[in-house]
UniProtKB/Swiss-Prot annotation:
Assigned GO CC terms: phagophore assembly site membrane
Subunit (UniProt): Forms homooligomers.
Protein family per UniProt: Belongs to the ATG10 family.
Membrane-related topology note: Peripheral membrane protein
Official protein name in the record: Ubiquitin-like-conjugating enzyme ATG10
Protein species of origin: Candida glabrata (strain ATCC 2001 / BCRC 20586 / JCM 3761 / NBRC 0622 / NRRL Y-65 / CBS 138)
Stated role: E2-like enzyme required for the cytoplasm to vacuole transport (Cvt), autophagy and nucleophagy. Acts as an E2-like enzyme that catalyzes the conjugation of ATG12 to ATG5. ATG12 conjugation to ATG5 is required for proper localization of ATG8 to the preautophagosomal structure (PAS). Likely serves as an ATG5-recognition molecule.
Length: 159
């Protein structure tokens, strides 16, 4: 089963407006972006003593016709009493995320002017090629596909 973009938009909008996602994740911030439709989430980085946060973007892969998870890990440091956030190095990112073996992480870049400027740039992406095998391919649950996808692809970030 593949997801059509219109189905993705409908399910993502429902997910963003419901409180279910916020019960499952310790969200610091969330924004539903409408064009192109994506959900921008910020969660605390609970694996590092130095603080920081993890930035998540749920968007749509038109190639695979599946949801796509993009991730950036930010480290917070203090210099002369002023806190700053900067992108974590790849080794720190890998250690922070503790990626399950069934997921493949790669480097991706958003350069599309349709996305807000703050979302453009380098991201790690969880490759969507095996999504159907991981989430399930049952047509009878098509209307809740994104809910199942979130439970597999998103909740491990906050463990």
């Amino acid at each position: 089963m593949t997801l059509e973009y219109e189905q993705f938009v409908q399910q993502l909008t429902r997910l963003a407006e419901s409180r279910e996602l916020y019960k499952k994740l310790p969200l610091l911030r969330h924004d539903l972006v409408h064009s192109p439709c994506c959900l921008h989430l910020t969660v605390p980085n609970s694996t590092r003593n130095t603080g920081g946060h993890i930035e998540l973007l749920i968007t749509f892969s038109r190639v695979y016709r599946e949801p796509l998870l993009l991730i950036r890990v930010w480290a917070t440091t203090a210099l002369d009493g002023i806190e700053t956030s900067q992108l974590a190095h790849s080794a720190e990112t890998m250690a922070t995320l503790r990626i399950p073996s069934y997921l493949t992480l790669g480097l991706d870049t958003i350069l599309d002017a349709q996305y807000p400027h703050a979302l453009q740039g380098a991201w790690y992406s969880v490759h969507p090629c095996d999504t159907r095998d991981i989430v399930g391919d049952d047509v009878t649950v098509r209307d809740t596909y994104l809910d199942r996808w979130v439970s597999v692809f998103l909740l491990w970030v906050c463990r």
